[in-house]
């Protein structure tokens, strides 16, 4: 009887250790790669902060490590330059790419229209494909986001609407051709603005200044991205 007991106890001990290792999910490293919107996303009330709060509500905080990698003024060529150090070095499991606003806005923005300006659309497309290719080669998955808004008038009369639509269309095309998931923020923003911006205001519904997100805008982005955190 004692011999059986000595055999059974180690058996159950091994089983419990194996169960502990197999039942504990791996912590996923998620990097958010972008411009000033993402740079602000890590601050209290920013969309990355909101995502952390939502994950905590579901009791999944230990399953995700969310890292912001946003720098103000960045465009696609800037992301290409810092991809290795700011994203790949983090060994991510998933990367959200939220870019495109400055690639359009800098054609007209006082800061830049007489300097480098925006990003030519062919360069924008090629740059996105290059970034995605390198991330996929590292073994990480990608969610490509469309650029959201430069101005909140839902009737299409914002100065940059036509060009921004072209760049958003390129982002959708790139996601389709590279077979990565698409988070269509522009469509989500326009839909929400058609519901809530009944006075055709230029700002103040989802942004504080036509571009950078207010509390409602950060919540909307977090809502759209949350579905991809599985």
Question: Model regions: which residues?
Answer:
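Alpha-helical cap/lid subdomain in secreted, periplasmic
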Residues: 2, 25, 50-53, 57-65, ...
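Bacterial Sec-dependent signal peptides at the C-terminal "C-region" and cleavage site
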Residues: 3-27
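Intrinsically disordered and other compositionally biased segments
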Residues: 6-8, 42, 78
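Flexible interhelical turns and helix-capping residues at alpha-helix boundaries
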Residues: 23, 41-44, 59
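Catalytic nucleophile-elbow at a beta strand-turn-alpha helix junction centered on a G-D-S/GDSL motif
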Residues: 28-43, 72-75, 104
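Extended hydrophobic secondary-structure segments that form protein cores and membrane-embedded regions
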Residues: 66-70
């Amino acid at each position: 009887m004692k011999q059986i007991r000595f055999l059974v106890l180690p058996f159950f001990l091994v089983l419990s250790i194996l169960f502990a290792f197999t039942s504990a999910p791996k912590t996923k490293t998620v990097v958010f790669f972008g411009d000033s919107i993402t740079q602000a996303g890590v601050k209290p009330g920013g969309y990355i902060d909101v995502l952390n709060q939502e994950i905590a509500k579901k009791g999944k905080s230990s399953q995700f490590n969310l890292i912001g990698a946003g720098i103000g003024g960045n465009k696609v060529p800037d992301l290409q330059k810092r991809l290795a150090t700011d994203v790949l070095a983090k060994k991510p499991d998933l990367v959200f790419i939220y870019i495109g606003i400055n690639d359009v806005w800098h054609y007209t923005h006082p800061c830049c229209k007489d300097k480098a300006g925006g990003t030519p659309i062919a360069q924008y497309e090629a740059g996105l494909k290059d970034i995605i290719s390198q991330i996929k080669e590292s073994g990480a998955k990608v969610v490509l986001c469309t650029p959201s808004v430069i101005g909140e008038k839902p009737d299409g009369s914002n100065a940059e609407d036509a060009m921004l639509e072209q760049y958003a269309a390129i982002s959708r095309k790139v996601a389709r051709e590279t077979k990565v998931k698409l988070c269509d923020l522009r469509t989500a923003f326009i839909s929400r603005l058609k519901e809530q911006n009944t006075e055709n205001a230029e700002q103040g519904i989802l942004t504080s200044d036509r571009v950078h997100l207010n509390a409602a805008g950060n919540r909307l982005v977090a809502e759209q991205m949350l579905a991809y955190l599985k």
